[in-house]
Amino acid sequence: TELLAKHYGWEAHFEDVIDNPYLNDFYNHMERWSFNLQIYFLKSRFEQLLKIKNNDGSIVQDRTIYEDAHIFAPNLKSMGLMNLRDFKNYQELFDLMESQIQGPNLLIYLRSNIPNLVNKIHKRGRDYENSISIEYLSRLNERYEAWTSTYNKGKLITIDVDELDFVENKKDFEIIVEKLDGELKEIGAA
């Protein structure tokens, strides 16, 4: 997100992981804090979308409101980490919010295998992420694949990043930019 914002001159909107009062608690006791965390992210992303709606410039967001509703919350429910009552409450709130927003012009899905994801998580160095299980990551990956295969809110580009290190390697970043340039021209955003 940061690299794309800098390259294209876009305004960046990041996932709130620093000020999030539930994140550390969630990773220590997922079942207890899953609903609170998902509601916090839903509120945070909706606030971002309201700001974006009133902005004339180009924006890049590191995670969409749709990912929580179609991937993270359902994953927590299916793993028994969010009960059905809380999940339904969450979904109804998401549905209400979704009726007030517009999908992104372009969604970029960075596809990655589990070993690569684990490596990136460790590189980030966030202590609270040390307890993330392989099962949890695998289920998220499966849900991302299913969701992106039916995504219909706008244009979607999938980039396999298993062999790319676009943060450390400028040539790898240029590969991504080249792919994006073509898509941006196609949607009239270049």
For each feature predicted by the language model, list its residue ranges.
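Conserved substrate/cofactor phosphate-moiety recognition/catalytic segment
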Residues: K6-S44
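Short glycine-/polar-rich loops that comprise or flank the Walker A/P-loop
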Residues: W10, I101-L106, N152-K155
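Hydrophobic/aromatic beta-strand patches that form the interior of the parallel beta-sheet core
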Residues: H13, Q61, L106-I108, I157-I159
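Conserved nucleotide-binding/hydrolysis micro-motifs of P-loop NTPases
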Residues: V17-D19, I65-E67, S112-L117, E163-F166
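A basic- and aromatic-enriched beta-loop-alpha substructure that forms the phosphate/nucleotide-
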Residues: R45-N83
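NTP-dependent small-molecule kinase module
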Residues: V118-A190
